Amino acid sequence: MLKGIHPAISPDLLKILAEMGHGDELVLSDAHFPAHQLHHKVVRADGISINSLLTGITPLFEFDTYTEAPLIMMQAVEGDSLDPAVEQSYLQTIKSAVGNVPKLARMDRFAFYERAKQAYAVVITGETAKYGNIIIKKGVTPVK
């Protein structure tokens, strides 16, 4: 155990966060996401919500400022609806940790799957919120 590291951040996830370079993306997926079909680098965070992971990741993670939207979520499939409270809770969690909210974009389901294939890794969570998947893009960590 390390001081200052949120308990939702496993050693495997901490290693991935450290390995990621600027421009790399991390998928935080819900419990139903086809992660193993889409990607070879999968970390399990069973029973842990995406909000809890965002609480732990955000203080360690610089969001990309060179892209229009460093946050990406899946848009609802035609004829379906999504709960805007899911997005709002994620954005509030990020804002609480870093003081601002990066821009978020949405893409259709299959475009999201294709984007996930290109990510650095996928984290399967215990999240059950419909359309709860989110991709976060890492930026350049400032030197202090």
Curated annotation (Swiss-Prot):
* UniProt entry keywords in alphabetical sequence: Carbohydrate metabolism, Cytoplasm, Fucose metabolism, Isomerase
**MF-aspect GO terms:** fucose binding; L-fucose mutarotase activity
Q: For this entry, list what GO says about its biological process.
A: fucosylation; L-fucose metabolic process
Kindly list the places in or outside the cell where this protein is found, as annotated in its UniProt entry.
Answer: Cytoplasm
Q: Report TM segments.
A: none
Q: Which residues are responsible for catalysis?
A: H22
InterPro entries recorded: L-fucose_mutarotase, RbsD-like_sf, RbsD/FucU_mutarotase, RbsD_FucU
- Statement: the UniProt record of this protein carries the keyword Isomerase: yes
| EC number from the UniProt entry | 5.1.3.29
Known pathway: Carbohydrate metabolism; L-fucose metabolism
The answer to whether keyword Metal-binding applies is no
- Catalyses which reaction(s): alpha-L-fucose = beta-L-fucose
| A GO-annotated cellular component | cytoplasm
Binding-site residues, substrate: D30, R109, Y131, G132, N133
Q: Which NCBIfam families match?
A: PRK15420.1
Its function? Involved in the anomeric conversion of L-fucose.
Q: Which family does it belong to?
A: Belongs to the RbsD / FucU family. FucU mutarotase subfamily.
Q: What does the annotation say about its assembly with partners?
A: Homodecamer.
User: Which HAMAP family does the record associate with it?
Assistant: L_fucose_rotase (MF_01662)
| Name of the featured protein | L-fucose mutarotase
* Organism this protein belongs to: Histophilus somni (strain 2336)
Q: What is the lineage of its organism?
A: Bacteria, Pseudomonadati, Pseudomonadota, Gammaproteobacteria, Pasteurellales
Gene coding for it = fucU
